[in-house]
Amino acid sequence: MSQESSYGKWTISSSDESEDEKPKPDKPSASSHPQAGQGVSKELIYTCSEARKVAHKRQISPVKFNDADSVLPHKKQKSDSPEGLGWCLSSSDDDQQPDVTQQEQPKRVLPQEKKHVSSPDVTTAQKVVDRSPPASLRPQRADDEYETSGEGQDIWDMLDKGNPFQFYLTRVSGIKAKYNSKALHIKDILSPLFGTLVSSAQFNYCFDVDWLIKQYPPEFRKNPILLVHGDKREAKADLHAQAKPYANISLCQAKLDIAFGTHHTKMMLLLYEEGLRVVIHTSNLIREDWHQKTQGIWLSPLYPRIDQGSHTAGESSTRFKADLTSYLTAYNAPPLQEWIDIIQEHDLSETNVYLIGSTPGRFQGSHRDNWGHFRLRKLLQAHAPSTPKGECWPIVGQFSSIGSLGPDESKWLCSEFKDSLLALREEGRPPGKSAVPLHLIYPSVENVRTSLEGYPAGGSLPYSIQTAEKQRWLHSYFHKWSAETSGRSNAMPHIKTYMRPSPDFSKLAWFLVTSANLSKAAWGALEKNGTQLMIRSYELGVLFLPSAFGLDTFKVKQKFFSSSCEPTASFPVPYDLPPELYRSKDRPWIWNIPYVKAPDTHGNMWVPS
């Protein structure tokens, strides 16, 4: 679909569904552009979203800032014009700001640790270079698997009983070492230090099989691996072709019978000689997702095998074992029966989180409470602490993609979805729904431009212009991405989190990390006058509730990686609180329009077509 306005002419996707939808069968999934630099392969061997394909294309064939004139016509871009698409192409598009040329850019220097990354008095060019590490210090592809893994650190120090939540971030290449000291790379998770691996199951959306195999220790690379995916037709054939060289890999296709659904769950089941571990996380199984993004991980304890003749069911107070078994059963897939049996043979009683899953289908009656936002609602009604009388505890949602939510907030966001997030134990009269603030965190154009990856980071933030134009009302809820607490302000989030903080943001009533973005496809939407919940996708997350830890509320940890005298029950929120509302010139990142007014941290522009 070609569009032309004062911004120039470009091609945009015709899809208005912002979930990470795989390309249609007749579209190629690989790029054949010549390699522009180290760290990026010449072509994508795995199937991915259109936004990610564009990001890959721009990484290997970048449009430099001084090349922009050859890409777009010489026309001044209006910063506040309601005509055309009505979108500013940069979040720093002040007409009074002098044009930036390559000659004006000072020599690049290492970024300094700052509380506020950018200052309004600094020119665009200076802001870009201040945050861009020298090319010589950027990890190269040949080494980065080692550099970003935690090899050499004492992993057991990280997994000690002093961390009751077992909630981690992935390691990020290009930030200070102290911010990676208690973070995990996939190689750490698969390390022999965690157990002697017998077999594993990898549930995910996007797979680079060759890369994945290299993340396993050499001694485990020939052990059985089950890949659970949602690919169809040519995408499925591509995945099978990737897996064909590996005799130990088998595949299981998740059924997706409702249009626009995806298999978005990200989970590892790891069977060891010593027991079983469950890992629920937010990263695709591709290099880019474990390199310079903010991602979340929950690690289960090592679950021991139940002794024969023992009368224990191995169930936890959170019913995690039953819920995980129910989730796997919902696939109705024979290859998963073996894993259901394995789970039944292990003792999961030490689990202190609740499982929140989504599975495709239409659910009525009591079945409606099993999945999606109604599952969250049911758990909060049963276990969430009631807020003190007279206090209005806000809701925070943070995500990397946004679906079509309707023409106004009443259609889904501030009706059924907010009702679920507001649920508490039935004690006292809660504040009116409209009085509860809703803070939504989604990266701005400026967040993406000044990120470690630069504009290509936006390939993992697939909010389209078609969807955005239909729901401008939503953007008044948006807050910037800022994560000084974890050193990840410049590592764009692919993590998804939802929580209920106190009015001063010092306490939490609950915290959820999940694969579910802000969409009806992920969370479900009511049909048939509210009697039926329809869900399109598979999703999975874990809910932290204070009652499961013997607490009334969680205290918010002041610094994510601090090991100071803060109480062990302080919860490590991975981004800054309170979140900062978009300013008048901030715009949400939209992947399929160009950004040519200012270069990113690599000196490049974003021209998606």
Swiss-Prot record:
EC number: 3.1.4.-
Active-site residues per Swiss-Prot or TrEMBL entry: H264, H494
Signal sequence, renumbered to the chain: none
Gene Ontology BP, a term: single strand break repair
Comp. bias (Basic and acidic residues): 105-118
Phenotype seen when the gene is deleted: Mice display an inability to rapidly repair single-strand DNA breaks due to covalent bonds between TOP1 and DNA. They are hypersensitive to camptothecin, topotecan and bleomycin.
List of residues that carry Phosphothreonine: T148
Modified residues (Phosphoserine): S61, S119, S132, S149
Gene Ontology annotations for the cellular component aspect, listed alphabetically: nucleus
InterPro entries: Tdp1
Expressed in which tissues: Ubiquitous.
Keywords, comma-separated and alphabetical: Cytoplasm, DNA damage, DNA repair, Exonuclease, Hydrolase, Nuclease, Nucleus, Phosphoprotein, Repeat
One MF term in the entry's GO annotations: exonuclease activity
Leading EC class: hydrolase
Compartments it resides in: Nucleus; Cytoplasm
Task performed by this protein: DNA repair enzyme that can remove a variety of covalent adducts from DNA through hydrolysis of a 3'-phosphodiester bond, giving rise to DNA with a free 3' phosphate. Catalyzes the hydrolysis of dead-end complexes between DNA and the topoisomerase I active site tyrosine residue. Hydrolyzes 3'-phosphoglycolates on protruding 3' ends on DNA double-strand breaks due to DNA damage by radiation and free radicals. Acts on blunt-ended double-strand DNA breaks and on single-stranded DNA.
Family: Belongs to the tyrosyl-DNA phosphodiesterase family.
Descriptive protein name: Tyrosyl-DNA phosphodiesterase 1
Organism: Mus musculus (Mouse)
GN (gene name): Tdp1
